[in-house]
Design a protein with these regions (language model features):
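An acidic, low-aromatic, low-complexity terminal/linker signal
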Residues: 1-166
Length: 166
């Protein structure tokens, strides 16, 4: 099985490091909208947003991966909306969107067991561009099944709130 299914990556910054996600997972890039908090959620779950009629949890990758424990949210904060393998929409808070990269499969490497600030189970692999390495995140593993189910149940309540206000 190939490390990635798409030969294009959307790259973004978390702290000083560059990361990538497969472009075929990306649905939209938006500035930080109104986020409805979810009670008792993990501290890296900022809440949920209404994204074109679909309620999506918002995950701050900076907090999730201990890159920034006290981030600031402004109207310039970026969310990348992505679809997971099971077709659920989630929003990922990042520091900045960088570029779209065409992946040369000869420069693609499996995820290392160490050497990155993010645990290897969240990685698809590495892509070497010139002299730097871009860490490719595995979107489908950022939330495990239990976390996704818990967020889905909590989001159902938010769906009712969004529906009532429409």
């Amino acid at each position: 099985m190939a490390i990635i299914e798409s030969n294009q990556l959307l790259t973004f910054k978390l702290g000083n490091e560059t990361y990538g996600i497969q472009i075929n997972k990306v649905r939209e890039i938006l500035t930080y909208p109104t986020v409805t908090p979810i009670p008792d959620a993990s501290r890296w779950v900022k809440g949920v947003i209404n994204l074109r009629g679909e309620v999506a949890p918002v995950i701050d990758l900076r907090v999730r991966f201990n890159i920034n424990d006290d981030p600031i949210y402004t109207n310039r904060t970026i969310i990348i909306a992505v679809k997971t393998q099971d077709m659920r929409m989630i929003g990922l808070v990042v520091d900045e969107v960088s570029d779209m990269e065409n992946v040369d499969l000869d420069r693609l490497y499996p995820a290392p067991d160490m050497g990155t600030s993010i645990a290897p189970e969240y990685l698809k692999g590495l892509f070497k561009k010139e002299e730097k390495m871009i860490v490719i995140l595995d979107i489908d593993r950022i939330l495990d099944k239990d976390e996704m189910q818990r967020l889905s149940r909590a989001s159902e309540g938010a769906t009712n709130v969004y529906s009532a206000s429409a």
